[in-house]
Design a protein with these regions (language model features):
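Charged docking surfaces used in two-component/phosphorelay signaling
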Residues: 16-24
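Short hydrophobic/Thr-rich beta-strand motif most characteristic of the beta2 strand and flanking loop
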Residues: 26-33, 41
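Active-site beta3 strand of CheY-like receiver
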Residues: 45-51
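C-terminal output helix
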Residues: 107-116
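Receiver (REC) domain active-site loop signature in two-component systems and cognate sites
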Residues: 56
Length: 121
């Protein structure tokens, strides 16, 4: 059975690129354009890992992480932040909210696959 990854990013280009890369490695990918849509999609899919941007409308990545970590059913899902915010305070905040890893855009697709594989293999 394929592992399911939920990608939350307001950029259609990023969602398509990451989805294509992960699909080529045998993962099933579910996409959301913001944190609110991501939270709506969690119950409909057995999500094994979340990749999220931080700057998104409606519900940003920080709030998405807090919502996932605060939900008994989803609290143990690994969460990888993929963001253009590269300051140490952003990394610290993301990790303190419960992120498992933090990757900075622009990114190497091999690095995303490596990070995903750490949690799903």
């Amino acid at each position: 059975m394929k592992k399911v990854i939920l990608i939350a990013d307001d950029s259609p280009t990023i969602r398509k690129f990451v989805s294509f890369s992960l699909t080529m490695h045998g993962f099933e990918v579910v996409s959301a354009s913001d944190g609110m849509e991501a939270m709506e999609k969690l119950p409909a899919h057995k999500v094994d890992l979340v990749i999220t941007d931080l700057n998104m409308p409606n519900l940003d990545g920080f709030e998405l992480i807090k919502s996932i970590r605060g939900n008994e059913e989803y609290k143990d899902i690994p969460i990888i932040i993929l963001s253009s915010l590269s300051g140490s305070e952003d990394v610290e905040k993301g990790m303190s909210y419960g992120a498992s890893s933090y990757l900075v855009k622009p990114f190497d697709p091999k690095r995303i696959h490596y990070e995903v594989s750490k949690y799903l293999n």
